[in-house]
Amino acid sequence: MDSPRSLTPQPLHLRRRPRFAICTLGCKLNQSDEADLRRSLRQAGLQEVDFGSEAEVYIVNTCTVTQLADRRSRQMLRRAHRQNPEALVAAIGCYPAVNPDELHAMPEVDIVVGSIEKATVVDEILGRLDWENQAFDSDEPVEHVETRTRRMIKIQEGCRAHCTYCIIPRARGAPRNVAPAEVVRRVQEAIDEGYREVVLTGTHVGTYKWPEGDRTLRLADLLELVLEATTIERLRVTSVGPHEIDERFIALVNHPRMAPHLHMALQSGSETVLRRMKRWYNPRQFRRAVRRLREEV
């Protein structure tokens, strides 16, 4: 039996500028990763096309939170191969992090890269392309996606909570945080590209922390810094928990440039069920946080 394509890499010889297409499934964090990936590939000289078009490189940014998500990821990988059987097809993200062998076994897939190693996928793709690259400008401006008005910017990734039902710690790894200066730089970059709203996203942004001298910066410090250092018209955050709703956070949410919207996940209203899930809050804490937000925001 022939070896899977992902285990027997071969260069792709081209006479034209390679085209790439990305399909992103799942969460806002994946959307942020997609934006970074798109930028890097464009700056390397590749041309972006719609995922339904013919391309030389297809990337499926996968999700694995459910069996349905796994199946959808496989469907998109097979679709990419059907559109151009000679193209490079890359499976990246959470599905490869959890079940890489399943993807290596797919004859349609050339590259398999998990979430933690996702930053290496551009180098891996470029290393597999053999093409004449004189006829492009590597400094061409990066346009934002016309169908989206918000830029997703990752400030944090990973989780160590290990709730009983959740695969995210396996898929995303241990918590890693983005330096405040880098977050500000990315927000300014989004402004320069024409975005008017930025969403600070992560696996659980409420756990954000960064050592700064003799203190530790938390999410509220980061929000304050972004609002002071940039002119972004609307700033939004995701994935906060009830115990992170304190007086300072509420004051920041009331800032005129902060979106009056928060996402707090509630898996169950039963204290027993939440305890069995190993969640880090109880129904009373959730009710108190919601009540306070309704009264003060």
Where do the language-model regions lie?
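Proteins enriched for Cys/Gly/acidic motifs involved in redox and nucleic-acid/cofactor modification
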Residues: M1-K209, R248-A251, L262, P283-E295
